[in-house]
């Protein structure tokens, strides 16, 4: 289910297929002839046993905290382990291929956190079972009219998280309900502190069964994939002011993602390097690149300050629609220090060579 794509039209069906393709592009392993992945590893437990089934490791850490109620009355679920910030979800484009704040045809910013389905109201909070499809009434306009990658990799309040994960049924995500997927005083560690979740590396056919078992395709932890190579080329060309070549490589990624191609006219909206960096942040979202990118670009002192880390008001017990949909600072001890641009030299190395000098600030 994608809000705004309810009508049974060819255009909407193609959009949904694009979303599903992007999910499988990240999770399908070499046995499915996935040519996107160049180098990846098969995660293992310490005893050598395979650890990458749908219920383990990297996948489980990203899952919502309650996925299915098991036959014995207990719950199976994940840890809400990775939650994108407000800045991260704002980088993803609208359907028009522009950041939301720069798209004149997108909703006014004053409307972003208002209901898309006008006249609808929040359903009663479920207590003993997961929330029903009615929770889509709480989808806000910010989450409508976005590009395919947004729906493939970002989970938000009211969305259909995955089609089969709840005992072969969809999971409808309610991040306001402390009895299901929301913040709970009895389980304060497993809650999204931003009001969003990552869906990257969640296999679309993954299932948590009421019996307690799981099923679904295995995935690999990606080290290098094709998109990164195109983005690397685009960045190099942009640094050399070779605009045509930079756009050509960027557009390979955008076209596959279902986003319109960039032209030189778009350079009036953002500079070429800003387009390159934003495209990299979207395409490689949650793959471990961003921290190192902002360091080598030397912009970490701008984008890694505590004031930059914001999200929706998800760390509240059973908030109302209005209480939840507020932008608030993330309550985490986040701090950037300029010394982090360089890593320290190990003391053992320093002591072995009197001519070595420690990196500044350590």
Model-predicted segments: where are they?
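Acidic/polar-rich alpha-helix caps and helix-coil junctions
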Residues: 1-86, 90-362
């Amino acid at each position: 289910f994608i809000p705004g794509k309810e009508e049974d039209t060819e255009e909407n069906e193609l959009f949904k297929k694009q979303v599903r393709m992007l999910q499988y592009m990240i999770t399908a392993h070499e046995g499915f002839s996935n040519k996107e992945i160049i180098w990846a590893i098969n995660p293992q437990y310490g005893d050598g046993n395979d650890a990458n089934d749908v219920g383990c490791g990297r996948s489980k850490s990203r899952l919502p905290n309650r996925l299915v109620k098991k036959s014995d009355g207990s719950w199976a679920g994940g840890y809400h382990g990775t939650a994108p910030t407000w800045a991260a979800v704002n980088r993803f484009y609208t359907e028009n291929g522009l950041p939301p704040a720069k798209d004149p045809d997108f909703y006014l910013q004053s409307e972003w956190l208002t209901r898309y389905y006008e006249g609808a109201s929040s359903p009663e909070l479920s207590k003993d079972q997961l929330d029903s499809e009615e929770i889509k009434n709480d989808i806000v306009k910010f989450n409508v009219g976005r590009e395919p990658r947004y729906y493939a990799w970002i989970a938000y309040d009211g969305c259909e998280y995955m089609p089969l994960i709840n005992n072969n049924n969809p999971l409808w995500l309610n991040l306001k309900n402390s009895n299901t997927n929301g913040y709970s005083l009895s389980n304060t560690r497993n809650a999204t502190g931003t009001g969003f979740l990552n869906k990257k590396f969640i296999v679309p056919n993954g299932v948590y069964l009421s019996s307690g078992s799981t099923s679904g395709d295995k995935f690999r932890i990606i080290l290098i994939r094709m998109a990164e190579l195109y983005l690397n080329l685009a960045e190099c060309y942009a640094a050399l002011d070779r605009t045509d070549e930079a756009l050509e490589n960027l557009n390979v990624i955008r076209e596959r993602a279902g986003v319109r191609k960039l032209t030189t006219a778009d350079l009036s909206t953002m500079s070429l390097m800003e387009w390159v960096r934003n495209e990299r942040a979207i395409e490689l979202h949650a793959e471990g690149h961003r921290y190192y990118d902002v360091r080598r670009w030397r912009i970490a002192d701008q984008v890694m300050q505590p004031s930059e880390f914001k999200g929706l008001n998800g760390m509240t017990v059973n908030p109302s629609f209005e209480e939840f949909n507020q932008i608030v600072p993330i309550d985490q001890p986040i701090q950037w220090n300029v010394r982090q641009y360089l890593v320290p030299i190990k003391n053992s190395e320093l002591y072995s060579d009197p001519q070595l000098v420690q990196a500044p600030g350590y």
